[in-house]
Curated annotation (Swiss-Prot):
Heme binds at H574, H597. PANTHER family: SULFITE OXIDASE, MITOCHONDRIAL, SULFITE REDUCTASE. It catalyses: nitrite + NAD(+) + H2O = nitrate + NADH + H(+). Residues 1-68 are annotated as: Disordered. Residues 49-62 have a biased composition (Basic and acidic residues). GO terms for biological process: nitrate assimilation; nitric oxide biosynthetic process. This is Nitrate reductase [NADH], clone PBNBR1405. Nitrate reductase is a key enzyme involved in the first step of nitrate assimilation in plants, fungi and bacteria. GO terms for molecular function: FAD binding; heme binding; molybdenum ion binding; molybdopterin cofactor binding; nitrate reductase (NADH) activity; nitrate reductase (NADPH) activity. It is an enzyme of class 1 (oxidoreductase).
């Protein structure tokens, strides 16, 4: 989404000069989008100076008649901008951005966030987008950010032009606007992922859930890329100049750390018919931070992913860009290619799958999702008007839009509204709107309404969805379903359902159909008795407010992909402890569940499914509004919490807490200690000993969560420390891509923000030998502490707590297994404690591969190792604490501890 410095007036919307094709730019002082709104500072944009006198043939030469005509159209577009902004509310700082790098950006609160808090990826609600018409207000323009928004200053920004050019240059913003002719015209931008959620409802792609509003239109002003390249003396094709690469300013994690970059063919860059510009104004204002202030690339008719924001470098090269995002994004791979195959067989690097130009697409926007059309004497006297948008790529004009009410048997041609004038080469860069009047009684008898568009090349939309790994370029017929309902007073009506709702919002007919399909697979006999997909009574339907009531250990329900699961009987068996379920009880936890669970876990979940979520928007539950009195209390989390006497960060285990990376220390070649600042300097984390947290990040556009135990003390103020073993790619042959989450913080710059969530876990050490395990007290004065690899961190946490209390006399016996001696984590701290407290802590190591002179055990943890180094199992005297790989727990610890007298169910506590 775009940011607006304020809901401003437009004193700079002056008539275009010299035909609207070649302008001199005369803006007055304007606020810098990079500055805090409370600061009274401004950027002095130069007034008209001598525009570079390029030769006539270098210019966009046009006749006087064309110039005059274009002049009128630019004025017309500017009137549209004013009209579009007439009922736009001011933007504001958003509380969701407070602890991210984007906290300084003003945004429109109505934007639907698609990837959580950060990075900011958003689209406007579809009705709101269409309400503003042909020109989209900047704050409602869709936003695709791969990371944090760079802070930029107009006065010191420059764009480097280098590579195969005779005169490399660093062009300042002043030079761009004063030394080159400017151009101004409307362009529709579309994300290649527009309508992706429809694909995700069929089969999950690797992309997040764009709805059908990943499209927006603005009036852009900038300088021609071809003019800039000519000024710098771009080489000919024979001289090797085949590609023009663009690089932005943001720091991103992809490929181990990079900028966002991509490229286009040089002949495209130099083609005057393509109108490619380096834009610095949008809808009559300087660009806003979310849209690339101070300068970005605009390539009309292309996908948004080629239009690099915060442009810093233009490089002319023989080869296309080698940037990570050029290859690992914006591709349409064959439908059979899954998430593993592209890396194994180099599919990413095959040129035939790259996306450049947009394809033909259309969407129904009226009726809206869950809109109800009453059927009565008044409404049946006049037709109902269906409406929507359509666009195509490459400058092709949309020539026809058709609607069917009978599944494609017959089609009605719609009325088209093209509100743009083509450029002098006949190219159309913007969406058009369509409408069709239909009889209400025809809608009543229809089961669905579908639309398809055609362009001047007679390209049209396929009937069925074509799934691809990245979920790109979805342009199948857009279908809405109709159902008869009874809105009030005994009337009947038609309720319309769109296929999906953007982001993680529930609803849409595709969710219902998927539920029916899964139910039919589980109960084959249903297929014979179910006449329509909306009559399936096999699954009970529940409202969201009903689900919210089941948010305690007595009754724990969750929602995943629109299905409702009763996890109450699984609380005691959950490997991550009951808290991992309870913090999500009564909520839709689709994103969190997908981020941390395997396919096996997803299949296991089906045993607990009890019904489906009602997605029509009606709620028959008691009033839960402010006026509902005590009913509001039903929404409160059931997890018992003591009122905090200190300022703690983890107040609510259901909420994410942003933390900033402030220090990174290399302990070994693959082990890092990361220090994160808590939101407030006087805060403690508030994590009970024995519990852990989730570290949350959006990686490659998907939420990723991993459990970690801090190594900082529980009373540390203002920060937490995490010791993480980094599993690098191309090290282990079984895992060529390495660890997704472990590599992520290592690739981040200081100052980057991640989220944490917790406390989680079923074990809590309460001090002096006392534990609380899944709500049951346990006691021991001797602890067998058994760890493998990174599993030492929860053990470390308990040791740290015990040794910090002089009156805690609990004896600890640690056996710590690793592959090699170099893999031993926090060894210095462990041995320091063992030396200082020899009567309270004893350490023994086991390594699979030992160096010469190794003083400890070699191989694996065996019964002999345990008998020699940990106490026997005695009821009320000893407990075993363990954390490590499942094979170690299952084959090395459980059978051998049982031989030593431990009750595996009661005396072995597994973190």
């Amino acid at each position: 989404m775009a940011t607006s410095v304020d809901n401003r007036h437009y004193p700079r919307l002056s008539s275009a000069l010299n035909g609207g094709v070649v302008h001199s730019f005369k803006p007055p002082l304007v606020p810098s989008p990079s500055l805090d709104r409370d600061q009274d500072q401004s950027v002095n944009v130069p007034t008209e100076k001598s525009v570079d006198k390029t030769t006539k043939e270098d210019r966009f030469d046009s006749s006087d008649d064309e110039d005059e005509s274009h002049n009128r159209y630019v004025s017309y577009y500017k009137e549209m901008v004013l009209k579009s902004n007439s009922d736009l509310e001011p933007t504001a700082l958003d509380s969701r951005d407070e602890s991210t790098g984007d906290k300084w950006i003003h945004r429109n609160s109505s934007m639907v966030r698609l990837t959580g808090k950060h990075p900011f990826n958003a689209e406007a609600p579809l009705p709101r987008l269409m309400h503003h018409g042909f020109i989209t207000p900047v704050p409602l323009h869709y936003v695709r950010n791969h990371g944090g928004v760079p802070k930029a200053e107009w006065s010191d920004w420059s764009v480097e032009v280098t590579g195969l050019v005779k005169r490399p240059a660093g062009l300042t913003m002043e030079q761009l606007i004063s030394e080159f002719p400017s151009r101004e015209f409307p362009v529709t931008l579309v994300c290649a992922g527009n309508r992706r959620k429809e694909q995700n409802m069929v089969k999950q792609t690797i992309g997040f859930n764009w709805g059908s509003a990943g499209v927006s239109t603005s009036l852009w002003r900038g300088v021609a890329l071809s003019d800039v390249l000519r000024r710098c003396g771009v080489y000919s094709k024979r001289g090797g100049a085949l590609n023009v690469c663009f690089e932005g300013a943001e720091d991103l994690p992809g490929g181990g750390g990079s900028k966002y970059g991509t490229s286009i063919k040089k002949e495209m860059a130099m083609d005057p018919a393509r109108d490619i510009i380096l834009a610095y104004m949008q809808n009559g204002e300087l660009l806003t931070p979310d849209h690339g202030f101070p300068v970005r690339v605009i390539i009309p008719g292309f996908i948004g992913g080629r239009m690099v924001k915060w442009l810093k470098r233009i490089i002319v090269t023989p080869q296309e860009s080698d940037n990570y995002y050029h290859y690992k994004d914006n591709r349409v791979l064959p439908s059979y290619v899954d998430a593993e195959l592209p890396n194994e067989e180099s599919w990413w690097y095959r040129p035939e799958y790259i996306i450049n130009e947009l394809n033909i697409n259309s969407v129904i926007t009226t009726p809206g999702h869950e809109e109800i059309l009453p059927i009565n004497a008044f409404t049946t006297q006049k037709p109902y008007t269906l409406k929507g948008y359509a666009y195509s790529g490459g400058g092709k004009k949309v020539t026809r839009v058709e609607v069917t009410l009978d599944g494609g048997e017959t089609w009605s041609v719609c009325e088209l509204d093209h509100q743009e004038k083509p450029n002098k080469y006949g190219k159309f860069w913007c969406w058009c709107f369509w409408s069709l009047d239909v009889e209400v009684l025809d809608l009543l008898s229809a089961k669905e309404v579908a639309v398809r568009a055609w362009d001047e090349s007679l390209n049209t939309q396929p009937e069925k969805l074509i799934w691809n790994l990245m979920g790109m370029m979805n342009n199948c017929w857009f279908r809405i379903k109709t159902n008869v309902c009874k809105p009030h007073r005994g009337e009947i009506g038609i309720v319309f359902e769109h296929p999906t709702r953007p982001g993680n919002q529930s609803g849409g007919w595709m969710a219902k159909e998927r539920q029916i399909e899964k139910s039919s697979e589980s109960h084959p006999t249903l297929k014979k008795s179910v006449s329509t997909p909306f009559m399936n009574t096999a699954s009970k339907m529940y409202s969201m407010s009903e689900v919210r009531k089941h948010n305690s250990a007595e009754s724990a329900w969750i929602i995943v992909h629109g299905h409702i699961y009763d996890c109450t009987r699984f609380l005691k068996d959950h490997p991550g402890g009951s808290d991992s379920i309870l913090i999500n009880a009564g909520t839709d936890c689709t994103e969190e569940f997908e981020a941390i669970h395997s396919d096996k876990a997803k299949k296991l979940l089906e045993d607990y499914r009890i019904g489906e979520l009602i997605t029509t928007g009606y709620d028959s539950s008691p009033n839960v509004s402010v006026h509902g009195g005590s009913s509001v209390m039903s929404l409160l989390a059931p997890i018992r919490q003591l009122a905090p006497t200190k300022n703690i960060a983890l107040v609510n285990p259901r909420e994410k807490v942003p933390v900033k990376l402030i220090e990174k220390t290399s302990i070994s070649h693959d082990v890092r200690r990361f220090r994160f600042a808590l939101p407030s300097e006087d805060q403690q984390l508030g994590l009970p000993v024995g519990k852990h947290i989730f570290l949350c990040a959006t990686i490659n556009d998907k939420l990723c969560l991993r459990a970690y135990t801090p190594t900082s003390t529980v009373d540390a103020v203002g920060y937490i420390d995490l010791v993480i073993k980094v599993y690098f790619k191309n090290v282990h042959p079984r895992f060529p891509n390495g660890g997704l989450m472990s590599q992520h913080p290592d690739s981040l710059p200081i100052g980057a923000v991640l989220d944490i969530k917790g406390p989680l876990g079923h074990i809590e050490y309460q001090g002096r030998g006392k534990f609380m395990v899944s709500g049951k007290p346990k006691f021991a004065n001797k602890l067998a502490m058994l760890a493998g690899g990174t599993g030492i961190t929860p053990i470390y946490q308990v040791i740290q707590s015990i040794l910090s209390d002089p009156e805690d006399e609990t004896e600890m016996f640690v056996v710590y297994a690793n592959r090699t001696e170099d893999d031993i984590l926090v060894r210095e701290e462990l041995e320091g404690w063992a030396s200082k407290f020899p009567d309270r802590l004893k350490i023994w190591y086991v390594v699979e591969i030992a160096k010469e002179g190794w003083e400890y055990s070699t191989g694996f943890i065996t019964e002999a190792v345990l008998r020699e180094h940990v106490p026997e199992g005695l009821e009320g005297e000893s407990l075993a604490l363990a954390c490590g790989p499942p094979p170690m727990i299952q084959f090395a610890l459980q059978p051998n501890l049982e031989k030593m007298g431990y009750d595996i169910k009661e005396d072995l506590l597994i973190f």
